[in-house]
Structures are given as C-alpha cells and as structure tokens.
Amino acid sequence: MIKTNVLRRAMDEIAARKGEFTLFALLMRADAPGTWDLVVSASWLESGNLKATREFVRLLAQSMGEESLHQFSRVVALDSNDAPVRFILENLPVEDDELRVQSTDLLGLQIQEAIIFRAKKPRPSPAALPNKALHPPAQKTRHG
C-alpha cells in the first residue's frame, strides 16, 4: 500500500518548488484492481508535455525515492480544463485534507477507490491580478 503521508509530503515539497497543484489524487481503476494511477494537474504541468511530466516524475522520485515510483501503474498529467479535473474540483473539493471515495463512476471511468489529496482551483498569481498602481481609480470632475 502507498504511504499517503509520504506522498503528501512529496506533493508539498514539489508544490513549494514549482507551484500549487490543482489536482493531486490516487485512483484505482476498476479494470486494474490493486494498482494506483497518480493523477495530477497544475498550471506548470501541461497535459501532453513530456518534458514537464518527466520533470514532475524526477521531483517525485527525488522526494519519495526511486523505488517508490514502482507503486504507481502510471502517472497522468491533466489540464485544469479537462472534464475529469473540472468535475472533481466542482464536486469533490479538497484543500489540506484527504478525501477517500469508494466505487464511483468518474465521467464514464469506473473507479474502485480514490484518494484525493488536493482538488482546489489555484489562486491567481500576482502577475495575473490587476495592478491598481497602474490603473488608478477614475477621477471625478466637476463641470459647471
């Protein structure tokens, strides 16, 4: 069995270095009992970007140990706009806890068990927020 406290620590260490995760979860598919998929989503971890996924796996191995990676049948990176991520964020939000779900259907994928460590929309980065210093409030003028 995967040591969830070790995985949580790895998640926290990687998030401190790279940025928050939108989703960090273990899923055991009904068609692959006894094996776990690690499913992650983060703004810095693009779906389909092998370089970013490779970097994530390297950081995971660095944090948990190379041998620990054999506990996962696969590591899946999803975009935050992907339907499964949006569904989990909307229906199973988790911030600093651990949510366990048994025997569920996740948008057509039969899940025997899920452990969700984080399912939270990321906070906007300071660069994405409007800078009030650059946009002062409109001045009222009197005509008269």
Predicted regions and their residues:
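Helical scaffold of the NTase/Pol beta-like nucleotidyltransferase catalytic core
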Residues: 1-18
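Residues that form or flank phosphate/diphosphate-binding pockets in enzymes
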Residues: 5, 33, 48
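Short secondary-structure junctions
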Residues: 13-22, 65-69
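Short edge beta-strands and adjacent turn/loop segments
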Residues: 19-36
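Short, flexible beta-strand-to-coil junctions
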Residues: 27-31, 43-44, 79, 120-122
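Catalytic metal-binding acidic patch
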Residues: 35-45
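Acidic, aromatic-enriched beta-alpha/helix-loop junctions
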Residues: 44-80
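Catalytic "initiation/cleavage/transfer" segments centered on a nucleophilic residue
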Residues: 67-144
